[in-house]
Amino acid sequence: MARTRVRIPSLLALSAVTLALVTGCGNNGDGKNKDTSSPAASGAPETGKKPVVVVTTTWEGAFAKAAGAEDVKVIVPQSVHHAPDYDPKPSDLAAVAKADFVLYAPFEPYAAKIKEAAGSKAKLVEVNLDNDPDKVKAEVDKLGGLFGTADAATTWKTGFDAEYAKLNKDLQTAWPGGKSPNVVTQVFTAWAAKLAGATTVGTYGPEAVTPAQLAGLSAKKPALVLDNAHMSTGTVLPDSGAEQVKIVNYPGEDLDLLPVYRNAAAELKKAMSTS
């Protein structure tokens, strides 16, 4: 998902300036090094201290917030759909330098370089970005344990389960003819098919659909095609008669994950009413 790659050269060029800003008054002129044995220096927040979390995108940010983090800084703005267009600012590296945790996804290999450029001792945490409910709750559990916010994570999961069940039930009542619709979904939007209780008859992506795949998927006669809004290549199965539904994976700037499910449910319900 190329949406979240940033320019590493820009980051490295900024690192010297940023480090000067954040460390210039570090030794108080006494020539002694600071103690690096504190919890903060090892990447873990001090006892009773709320963790400072830096994330690459709003998706990781929403997971962190769900897990109980309150101090969350997003590096790549939500408005950047093609991250090479984003020029990192000194404030980005300054934020990483002060972080306890830096969250990234496995398809974002630049995260370690961001941390290195900032000279941060933060703990680098890989997050499995998938809105499948079971995977979301597993990540929230993991992060809550790391942050020391397990109780907050448990509370969020309870609310999430209730909202998910409500949306799933509402979508099932909208099934055309009372029957689970057949769908073809992009690999990163399969969670939305699950939310609708739909029957997945095929998947595609993240690479472009080949002529052979096009023929094979069209032959399955899906009622719906779920398209990843962040990686859309236009109409996936032209002339198939399937209704194409755009699914958004990334949360907004409020880092609230629940609207992602509500918005997907609204789009799915609308599509099922016309299929």
State where each predicted segment sits.
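Sec-dependent bacterial lipoprotein signal peptides
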Residues: 1-23
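Bacterial lipoprotein signal-peptidase II cleavage site
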Residues: 22-38
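Basic- and aromatic-lined ligand-binding clefts that recognize polyanionic substrates
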Residues: 53-55, 60-64, 152-205, 209-216
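Alpha-helical, coiled-coil/dimerization segments enriched in small aliphatic residues
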Residues: 68-89, 188-215, 246-257
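Acidic/His-rich segments in extracytoplasmic proteins that coordinate ligands and/or metal ions
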Residues: 71-150, 234-242
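Extracytoplasmic substrate-binding proteins
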Residues: 116-183, 255-275
